[in-house]
Amino acid sequence: MPKEIRWGVAHIFSSPNNTFVHITDITGSETASRVTGGMVVKADHEKPSPYAAMIAAARAAQQAMERGITAIHIKVRAPGGYGPKTPGPGAQAAIRALARSGFIIGRIEDVTPLPHDTIRRPGGRRGRRV
């Protein structure tokens, strides 16, 4: 008898400064695990690295599997808005680590919030005065 497939969603937020891996159930209301790059490395300058993202994703996957999730859809997000529209350096490493950890992979999609016209940066006309 084939084992039952239990779907989850892996929300990967990858900025130039850190990578978050947040695995929820299919509705997104119940968190199975949440790990960041800063939780797995000692030095702050290592937080955005692909290595930190890989370790964070592997740890999140292990915690989610203990809670019974066997298959995941992946949603990748960059800061968007007036920030960078492309994911940071840890996104691809996190996706590869989730695929290697034994999950069945469903869909991979980009959910970066993109403005339809443009967004005015904070700081005003004369800029941020330091």
Curated annotation (Swiss-Prot):
<comment type="similarity">
    <text>Belongs to the universal ribosomal protein uS11 family.</text>
</comment>
<dbReference type="GO" id="GO:1990904">
    <property type="term" value="C:ribonucleoprotein complex"/>
</dbReference>
<dbReference type="GO" id="GO:0019843">
    <property type="term" value="F:rRNA binding"/>
</dbReference>
<comment type="function">
    <text>Located on the platform of the 30S subunit.</text>
</comment>
<keyword id="KW-0699">rRNA-binding</keyword>
<dbReference type="InterPro" id="IPR019961">
    <property type="entry name" value="Ribosomal_uS11_archaeal"/>
</dbReference>
<dbReference type="GO" id="GO:0005840">
    <property type="term" value="C:ribosome"/>
</dbReference>
<keyword id="KW-0687">Ribonucleoprotein</keyword>
<dbReference type="Pfam" id="PF00411">
    <property type="entry name" value="Ribosomal_S11"/>
</dbReference>
<keyword id="KW-0689">Ribosomal protein</keyword>
<dbReference type="GO" id="GO:0006412">
    <property type="term" value="P:translation"/>
</dbReference>
<dbReference type="GO" id="GO:0003735">
    <property type="term" value="F:structural constituent of ribosome"/>
</dbReference>
<protein>
    <recommendedName>
        <fullName>Small ribosomal subunit protein uS11</fullName>
    </recommendedName>
</protein>
<dbReference type="InterPro" id="IPR036967">
    <property type="entry name" value="Ribosomal_uS11_sf"/>
</dbReference>
<comment type="subunit">
    <text>Part of the 30S ribosomal subunit.</text>
</comment>
<dbReference type="InterPro" id="IPR001971">
    <property type="entry name" value="Ribosomal_uS11"/>
</dbReference>
<keyword id="KW-0694">RNA-binding</keyword>
<dbReference type="InterPro" id="IPR018102">
    <property type="entry name" value="Ribosomal_uS11_CS"/>
</dbReference>
